[in-house]
């Protein structure tokens, strides 16, 4: 279960079916993340990409805060269906576009489609191999997915030490960390 922390659906509790193997971002980490994002960005005006969307907690939190252009990519059919049904229940269908796809395959194809995003959030499985973390970062930062001066947030286990030239900072919240990247206009 997770709770929408702020916005139009503040306090709304959403329970995923018990047979879903998911790890929604904790309320504590979620609140900290959105405090940072809302301080830096006008969420209502952004184009957002939510990768490894799981059951959609980040997408729904963004929609609740007024974000109108959210693309959620999730490979698991049941999870994607849950995001879709929850978006309908909360009247977020016009704000959240759910795509069922392997994130890595989708990113490789998306670079040729011309759409880029102001904010990219990725919450890959915690057991993702280190080389795939680096591939994910590279695909997002170097393939036109993130707009110039856009913000990419990678959620990962705190024990993973992420390094990259475009890494701005990492914030730790217990076992979870958020690494913030900015694609700068000038290298």
Q: Residue ranges of each PLM-predicted region?
A:
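Class I S-adenosyl-L-methionine-dependent methyltransferase catalytic core
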Residues: 1-187
